[in-house]
Curated annotation (Swiss-Prot):
InterPro entries (alphabetical): ACT-like_dom_sf (IPR045865), ACT_dom (IPR002912), Chor_mutase/pphenate_deHydtase (IPR008242), Preph_deHydtase (IPR001086), Preph_deHydtase_CS (IPR018528)
Domain Prephenate dehydratase per the UniProt entry, residue ranges: 3-189
Organism whose genome encodes this protein: Mycobacterium marinum (strain ATCC BAA-535 / M)
Recorded GO CC terms: cytoplasm
Residues of the site described as Essential for activity: T182
Name of the protein this chain belongs to: Prephenate dehydratase
Swiss-Prot/TrEMBL GO biological process terms: L-phenylalanine biosynthetic process
PROSITE patterns: ACT (PS51671), PREPHENATE_DEHYDR_2 (PS00858), PREPHENATE_DEHYDR_3 (PS51171)
Native organism taxonomy: Bacteria, Bacillati, Actinomycetota, Actinomycetes, Mycobacteriales
Amino acid sequence: MARIAYLGPEGTFTQAALLEIAAAGLVPGHDDGGAQPLPVESTPAALDAVRTGAAEFACVPIENSIDGSLAPTLDSLAIGSPLQVFAETTLDVAFSIVVRPGVGAADVRTLAAFPVAAAQVRQWLTAHLPSVELHPAYSNADAARQVAEGQVDAAVTSPLAAAHWALQSLADGVVDESNARTRFLLIGVPGPPPPRTGTDRTSVVLRIANVPGALLDALTEFGMRGIDLTRIESRPTRTGLGTYMFFVDCVGHIADDAVAEALKALHRRCADVRYLGSWPTGQTYAGQPPPADEAAIWLQQLREGKPEASPGPPL
């Protein structure tokens, strides 16, 4: 079974995502659904476990529909030895407010919450526990552990963690936005990407010269080839004030001619291109990359020594 590091302890949404990815047979070399979860204390620690060989893969959150992308994940992917994305899954996220058995809402003075979770239930807490004192937790499951061990009165946590620690629920299905979702990635050391499925995503990190028009020129490599971008985001390079790297996700696979040509052009144009992978999403996008054009087919036939196979465009 594949050792997969994740933000622990047992009972986090990340563990649920890990189990879903494994059950779907999306772990390279382990399509039997088997996985050995390896809980760690943070998302960067999960990725470092892959880099050091302590785990074969890591399952980490990358973005949620409430607060957007998660900076610790982005930074850990861009800095350090290269890693690659092999699969993803998206979970509907709703929280439970839990206490020890016999504790009522009127008894709650302190509440533990993972900061990402606290941001997604802020309105509920204001309405139902306006005077509660918030205590930080390093994960949703850690918040539940703090309640079970008597460190706080209540926690914002996952149903999985609540069941694991045998806690009592004050409220279930708590979330300020009813369509809250979080996307998770399966990440390993670089290797051959999963085969093209037609519903794929490709991601890169671009470092470009700090000159006028440089970003526009880089993005034009996608636009001129009809490639749809699904995300573009900047993060500091940490090498100097005002210097940034750019995370770009696009529809398509490195096996698509248009995507491959864009990546080659970016490699020539940018100071650095870090390829984060091409992987199946299971989602159909309207802007699929265009198929190989007639000129590309003609060139491939020349390489194969078959110039007569293509009649060329009509005169």
